[in-house]
A protein has these predicted regions:
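Amphipathic alpha-helical segments within well-ordered protein domains
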Residues: 45-48, 86
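Histidine- and aromatic-rich ligand-binding microenvironments
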Residues: 4-5, 39-41, 94-95, 117, ...
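Acidic, PIN/NYN-like endoribonuclease modules and their adjacent C-terminal/linker elements
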Residues: 1, 73, 102-131
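Short, well-structured N-terminal submotif of metal-dependent ribonuclease cores
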Residues: 1-39, 52-61
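Conserved glycosyltransferase catalytic-site signature
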Residues: 6, 41, 79, 98-102
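Structured helix-beta-strand junction loops
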Residues: 32-34, 69-70, 91, 123
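Acidic catalytic patch
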Residues: 15, 70-91
Length: 131
């Protein structure tokens, strides 16, 4: 199972270059059931605000698509994950949002995190997959 960082959805929605195409291809594979995926409920916030800053007309549509995406579990952020994220912050000095994504991916037993963010490379317990 793949854990999707917010940047996968952002690139898919607004990037017209190769990385945007790769993100759209990955999401299509998930949609068709070729891959299973998960992401945090917090991804909604990141995706909405990032897209709203660049292409406000796409923010709501993209957010609805994310929240209703087939073959993808949306994992709630809770106290247990927040405590786990604090442990990750302490050990790897990640930003809180990145640590929450890492904690969520690890708790969900994801095979890897799909992200363009190199901060995730610090974690020995979680492999990062590029788009």
């Amino acid at each position: 199972m793949l854990y999707l960082d917010a940047n996968v959805f952002i690139y898919a929605a607004i990037n017209t270059e190769e990385i945007g195409e790769k993100a759209r291809t990955l999401l299509q594979k998930i949609q068709q059931g070729e891959e299973k995926a998960a992401t945090s409920a917090l991804t909604f916030d990141e995706v909405f605000w990032s897209i709203k800053k660049r292409k406000p007309e796409l923010a709501i549509e993209t957010s609805y698509a994310l929240l209703n995406f087939p073959n993808m579990e949306i994992i709630p952020a809770d106290r247990k994950l927040a405590v786990f994220a604090l442990e990750i912050i302490k050990e790897y000095n990640l930003a809180p949002r990145d640590a929450l994504h890492a904690a969520t991916a690890l708790a969900a037993k994801a095979d890897c995190i799909v992200s363009t963010d190199p901060h995730f490379d610090k974690l020995k317990e979680l492999k990062r997959q590029l788009l």
